[in-house]
Amino acid sequence: GNILVALYNDTPKHRDNFLKLVNYGFYNGCIFQRVIKNFMIQGGDYSTRKVTPGKVEKFDVDYTVPAEIIYPKYYHKRGQLCAAREGDDENPTKASASTDFYITWGRNFSPRQMEYTVNKMKNEGKNYAIPSEQIQQGYMKHGGVPHLDNGYTVFGEVLEGLEVVDKIQNVATNKENNDRPLEDVVILKATQVK
């Protein structure tokens, strides 16, 4: 199936990096290498890329993209395109990986579940961004992953193809192999529409 995303202009470093990779054909043949039901689908890892036989392709992917976290304007509601990154201990500036991205799915929250989640986030002693009432309403309406807010750059959103994201997030995975799908879910082709 097809997934159409819009990239945010107020995250220009991430937008431009993603478009550069799309236009180079980098994502063609990559897989969604990490899939966690009711959480997210992650793709773009260089090591998963299928190389075209008879063609030498070399990409410089040994860089990071400076964080462009614009919270609360962009939060981890369902269908957000976000940049993966190393954890806080290795990466206190929250710089993004050069190629890895994820699309959020998360769960739909009832008012009671949302209240429980917010209280848990407040009491865990981690530096979570506690969602405002308006953002909580968004999570109850659309679903999402609130514990990632203000920790990762959200740089776009799915405009069409959420049903494809849903199918991918429901595939069988190997939990002992970093949640890799048992059968490869391949990005056949990524192109810039406009």
State the predicted function of each range.
Residues 1-194:
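Cyclophilin-like peptidyl-prolyl cis-trans isomerases
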